[in-house]
Amino acid sequence: MDTMNLLKKSYMDAGISPEVYDYCHGISSRMKDRFAQIDQVAELNQIKVLRAMQKNRVSAACFESSTGYGYDDLGRETLEAVYADVFRAESALVRPQLTCGTHALTVALSAMLRPGDELLSPVGRPYDTLEGVIGTREVNPPGSLKEFGISYRQVDLLPDGSFDFERIKAALRDNTKLVTIQRSKGYDPRPTLSVERIGELIAFIKSIKPDVI
């Protein structure tokens, strides 16, 4: 008996009917190419991380404990250099003190925006948790962007979920410093934005205001 038939018989002995086995095996066969693509992406990313670790000379010394003050903290500096290389960024901030996505976005927005600047969202409302950070609630917590003189402008998507390019163009002003694009739909009924659609939106905005972040 070949391996395939032996496997099928083993499932039958376990109470799985031949019809169920054939159905599941057929799905697995049809998904084989897709799983192979996923494995290739995983392998590519693994090589990318390994090369970044080699470039930044990750060693056992990077895992030594530090005083807690950050003096000569080789491990932390090396980890951030690895992240920057992997994501092709100028630099990276990788700290356990950043506890969630809203926390990370708050740090980024606060670092890049200054009084008089404007933040633009061309895809409608951001996450509820960001409203307090931006300052769009009726009662905002201390330290919101609004409190520091940073304005906010928003352009909603069209009813069919597409970008309102005309209104986005009109919303880009001289003091528009940063554009935030939320890919996830969050709690809104709109579809999640694909990478391709986000790229299209970024290209459009950059063609109008190249210096915007």
Sequence positions of predicted segments:
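Conserved beta-loop-alpha segment that forms the PLP phosphate-binding cup at the N-terminus of a helix
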Residues: 92-118, 122, 127-137
